[in-house]
Amino acid sequence: KDQEPHYMENVIYNELLYRGYHVSVGAIPVFDHSSGKTQRGSLEVDFIAEKFDETIYIQSALYIPDDEKMEQELRPLRKIGNSFKKVLITKYEGNGAYDEDGILHLNLFDFLLNEKSLD
């Protein structure tokens, strides 16, 4: 059971490769100014999928049991300062809709069974 999130990431990674994407892991630089000093950090994005001039940032989460976990997963996507597509894939919760930040929420099965799910 502990390995299930890793298996899910593996499935997503392989599906992205199958669809012709170059896939990498990304670190998004973030800056915190709350202390009066600028502190630099980074947030990890699970996948950066690139094909031709298309870039998609993808976060993967097995479950989103509460608002805190949702914020943890969405924060890196919200911090990306460009207009490329951003997607959160969960095992069951995603319904194929965009949220108020323009992030697409997909469930794993819709992602796998619909090759156009990222279009």
Residues of each region from the PLM?
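A cross-kingdom feature that marks ATP-driven nucleic-acid transaction machinery
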Residues: 1-119
